[in-house]
Amino acid sequence: MASAVLSSVLTTASRFALLQVDSGSGSDSEPGKGKGRSNGKSQTLGNKATSNEKKREKRRKKKEQQQSEANELRNLAFKKIPQKSSHSICNVQHELSSPNPAQKESREENWQEWRQKDEQLTSEMFEADLEKALLLSKLEYEEHKQDYENAETASTQTKGINKKDKRKNHQGKDKPVTVSLKDFQCEDHISKKAEESNSAQTLSHDGGFFNRLEDDVHKILIREKRREQLTEHNGTDNSPAPEHNQEVGLKDGRIERLKLELERKDAEIQKLKAVITQWEAKYKEVKARNGQLLKMLQEGEMKDKAEILLQVDESQSIKNELTVQVSSLHAALEQERSKVKVLQAELAKYQGGRKGKRNFEPDHCR
């Protein structure tokens, strides 16, 4: 909207640039003429004087244009209607009275250009306002969506209550029913909510509501443009060729703007696609690294487990061998013990027999 306002300011400021200021030209040219008549100078001096006068007029025009532009900008900034000065009105009347065909043609061309610019600006501003209104309506609908849902539930409840009331009324038609003020207000509030819920349901069920609304807005714009063209045609007896050219120019300008927007959006999409591909490549790399790390960890764990199991098996086999050796040694020890006992018994017998023989021999000698 700010850009539209600035553009409108520029257009209004530049309109007054087309007006010529001839108020001081007469006063400055008259003494020159008098001097030429009185003194009777040559043509060269007259040309120089006219060139100087033209330069002065140009300077004055520039100053007046700058002043008018500054005043209009001030008035627009403080929301005041720009008041045309009497000096500018006199200049306009003087220009209209001067019958110069070249100036008339240039004015008509400039007028047509400014009219085209004004129409384009007004149409763009109107479309922008309509788009804003559509967006606001969408936002309001989204904000009040839950309210509509609550209203739907309330409407279902009210329907059930109304059915019960109807049954009661059918049963007792002759009996007058008294309703309190609170109940009456509640019923009105519930009925309003039910109407709002019904409208919300129609909006929610109709998915293409906003699309149809945009189409209607486009149709309205086209109708208004046609009406403006017809009014201009009736007011000013001009041929329909420039109007058609204006329509074509407006359409071409819109098409070019849309093409530029599409190109810009396509470039943004391409950039986003490139970023997505980069992130996908990085994601795949990270995934592959994680898979390799997981495999390495699993292999390390399996190796550790296998080594531990081998050590356990070896220790178990060593234990079995040692138990076998111990059992065999224990059996050999028992055998040796039994042998020792037998030998001890034999030795004891042998010693006892020798003692008896020794005792028997001396007795026999006596």
From Swiss-Prot:
Composition bias type Polar residues, residue spans: 39-50, 83-103
Subcellular location: Golgi apparatus
Modification Phosphoserine, positions: S23, S25, S27, S106
Keyword Repressor: no
Induction: Down-regulated by TNF in adipocytes (at protein level).
Residues forming coiled coils: 47-77, 128-160, 250-299, 326-353
Region feature Interaction with IRS1, mapped onto this chain: 1-95
Expression by tissue: Predominantly expressed in testis. Expressed in the adipose tissue (at protein level). In the testis it is restricted to spermatocytes and early round spermatids. Also expressed in cardiac fibroblasts.
UniProt biased composition (Basic and acidic residues): 104-115
Keyword Zinc-finger: no
Top-level division of the source organism's lineage: Eukaryota
Family annotation (PANTHER family): G KINASE ANCHORING PROTEIN 1, G KINASE-ANCHORING PROTEIN 1
Sequence similarity: Belongs to the GKAP1 family.
Subunit organization: Interacts with PRKG1. Interacts with IRS1.
Function of the protein: Regulates insulin-dependent IRS1 tyrosine phosphorylation in adipocytes by modulating the availability of IRS1 to IR tyrosine kinase. Its association with IRS1 is required for insulin-induced translocation of SLC2A4 to the cell membrane. Involved in TNF-induced impairment of insulin-dependent IRS1 tyrosine phosphorylation.
Protein name (record): G kinase-anchoring protein 1
Organism from which the protein derives: Mus musculus (Mouse)
